[in-house]
Regions:
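Histidine-rich, glycine-flanked metal-binding segment
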Residues: 30-32, 41, 46-86
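Divalent metal-dependent hydrolysis catalytic cores, especially in the metallo-beta-lactamase
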Residues: 119-145, 159-169, 213-224, 255, ...
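Histidine/acidic residue-rich metal-binding segments in metalloenzymes
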Residues: 148, 198-298, 322-341, 389
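Histidine/acidic-residue-rich catalytic or RNA/ligand-binding cores of hydrolases
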Residues: 101-103, 146, 175, 226-229, ...
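Active-site mouth loops of central-metabolism enzymes
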Residues: 105-117, 185-202
Length: 431
C-alpha cells in the first residue's frame, strides 16, 4: 500500500467527518484562555473531590486548578453545571482497524484504504466517548497504516485520541490469529507479521520501528483449549526469545506488550520483563509475584469476553464463554489481592467503538473500587503509554485533556458511560 493511497483515504474521510459531525472536527487550541467550571472536580492522585471545581486552560495545557481560579481578561467560561470533571479517559487495549464481525473476513474482503477509513471513524467515536488517549494493539493485517492515522490526529487534520501504535502484532507461523483454514494455495493476507526465531523477531521489530511503531505487540500464547477437563493455552515464544525481544525493544527506545493467558507463556513474559500482559488470566503464583515485583501491568479486557459470551453462536458456546469470564473474575481478584499493577483496556474493535467504558463497570463488578479503577486507568494508563506527567491528572503543566460526566463517578462508575463534555489539548470536541 502506498503513502499516496493512505493520504487519499484520510483526506476523503476528513471531509466526511467534518460534514457529518461538526462537533467532532479537529482544530487548534484557541488563543484565548478558557475557564472550565463544574460542581465537582476529581483529584485522581489523592481521591479527593474538589467542590466546586475550576480549571484554567491556556492553549493546549492546564494552567491552574482549584475551587476557584484566575479569570484573565478575554476568558471564555464554560459552565458544566452539576457534573464531575476528571482527566480524559485512557483505553490501553484497542483495535481501531477492527469492527464487529469476523476478523479474518475483514482482512480478506476489505482493502487497507477502506480499513483506514474505518479506523479513523473509530478514533472519532472513541474520542467522543471521552477517551483522549489510547494504545492500539495491532492493525490485524493493515500493517503500519496506523502510523498515518496517528500522524493525522497529531497534526490536527482529523479528530481522535492521542495514540500509541504498534502496526501489526508479531506472531509465529500458524499461531494465534493466523489465517488458518483457507486453501493453502490461495494467498491470504496474514493478520500479523511472522517471526519464528529470535533473529526473526528482531528483524521484524526493526522494520516496525522504521515504519513508526511506538511499541511492540507480540502474541505469546494461542487460543484457549480444554485439556483433561482444564483450560490450557500453548505458548508461542520461549523465555529466551522474549528476552531478546525486550532487549531489542529497549535498544530502540520501545517496550513490549504481549497477548498472553495461561502458563508457561505468561511466566516467560514476566521473566523477560515485558511492559504489560494483556488478557492476563490463568496465571501461576510465580507469575503474579514477578508482575508485582517488576511492575508489569495486567490489562484484563473483561468487556471483550463479556461481548463474546453474550453474542455466542450457540447456547453451549455462550455458556463456555460465560464460564471463562467467571474464571477471569476469580483471577482478577487474586491479582488485586497480590497488588499486581492494573491498567484499563477493553479490546474494543470486535465490539463497537465508543462503547468501551463498560470496562470500568466490569472492573468494579469484579472487585475494584471506582477510585482504584480510575487510578488504574488514568495514572497507570499514562505510565504504560509513556505519558506520565503529561496526561492522566488535572494539574498545571499537563495537557488540557478533560471530560465531564453527570453525577459522581466515585459513587456510580457507570456515569463514565455517559461522557457529556470532551476537551483534548484545549480543544472542545463535545459539550
Amino acid at each position: 500500500m502506498t503513502t499516496r493511497i493512505l493520504l487519499i483515504a484520510l483526506v476523503s474521510l476528513s471531509l466526511v467527518t467534518f460534514v457529518a459531525d461538526a462537533a467532532g472536527q479537529a482544530a487548534a487550541a484557541p488563543s484565548h484562555p478558557i475557564v472550565l467550571h463544574a460542581a465537582r472536580l476529581l483529584d485522581v492522585k489523592t481521591g479527593r473531590t474538589v467542590k466546586p471545581g475550576e480549571i484554567l486552560v491556556q492553549g493546549d495545557h492546564i494552567v491552574e486548578v482549584g475551587t476557584t481560579v484566575k479569570h484573565p481578561g478575554g476568558s471564555e467560561v464554560i459552565d458544566l453545571g452539576d457534573r464531575t470533571m476528571l482527566p480524559g479517559l485512557i483505553d490501553a487495549h484497542i483495535h481501531l482497524f477492527l469492527h464487529p464481525g469476523a476478523e479474518d473476513l475483514q482482512t480478506v474482503q476489505e482493502s487497507v484504504p477502506q480499513r483506514t477509513i474505518t479506523a479513523t471513524l473509530a478514533a472519532r467515536d472513541d474520542l467522543m466517548a471521552g477517551f483522549t488517549a489510547e494504545r492500539d494493539m495491532g492493525t490485524e493485517g493493515a500493517g503500519s497504516a496506523d502510523t498515518a492515522v496517528r500522524n493525522a490526529i497529531d497534526e490536527g487534520r482529523i479528530p481522535g485520541p492521542r495514540l500509541r501504535i504498534s502496526g501489526n502484532a508479531i506472531n509465529i507461523l500458524g499461531g494465534h490469529e493466523d489465517a488458518i483454514g483457507y486453501n493453502p494455495e490461495q494467498r491470504v493476507l496474514p493478520n500479523a507479521n511472522y517471526a519464528n526465531t529470535a533473529d526473526e523477531l528482531i528483524a521484524v521489530m526493526r522494520q516496525q520501528f522504521k515504519e513508526g511503531a511506538d511499541f511492540i505487540k507480540i502474541y505469546e500464547t494461542g487460543a484457549d483449549s480444554v485439556r483433561d477437563g482444564k483450560l490450557a493455552t500453548s505458548y508461542q515464544y520461549s523465555e529466551a526469545q522474549l528476552e531478546a525481544a525486550v532487549k531489542e525493544a529497549a535498544r530502540l527506545g520501545r517496550r513490549v506488550a504481549v497477548h498472553a493467558t495461561g502458563e508457561p507463556g505468561t511466566l516467560f513474559a514476566a521473566q523477560a520483563g515485558v511492559a504489560s500482559i494483556d488478557h492476563a488470566d490463568q496465571l501461576s503464583d510465580e507469575t503474579v509475584r514477578l508482575m508485582k515485583e517488576k511492575q508489569i501491568f495486567a490489562v484484563p479486557t473483561f468487556t471483550i469476553f463479556e461481548y463474546f459470551a453474550d453474542h455466542a453462536a450457540t447456547p453451549e458456546q455462550g455458556a463456555r464463554e460465560h464460564q471463562m469470564l467467571e474464571v477471569k473474575a476469580q483471577e482478577f481478584r487474586k491479582q488485586i489481592a497480590a497488588r499486581v499493577p492494573m491498567a484499563v483496556g477493553s479490546d474494543v474493535g470486535p465490539f463497537p467503538h465508543g462503547t468501551q467504558a463498560r470496562e470500568f463497570v466490569l472492573m468494579v463488578k469484579y472487585g475494584m473500587s471506582p477510585l482504584a479503577v480510575l487510578q488504574a486507568d488514568l495514572l497507570n494508563g499514562a505510565k504504560l503509554l509513556g505519558w506520565e506527567e503529561q496526561i492522566g491528572a488535572l494539574e498545571p503543566g499537563y495537557f488540557a485533556d478533560v471530560v465531564a460526566v453527570p453525577g459522581d463517578p466515585l459513587q456510580d462508575v457507570s456515569s463514565l458511560q455517559n461522557v457529556q463534555f470532551v476537551m483534548k489539548g484545549g480543544v472542545v470536541y463535545k459539550k
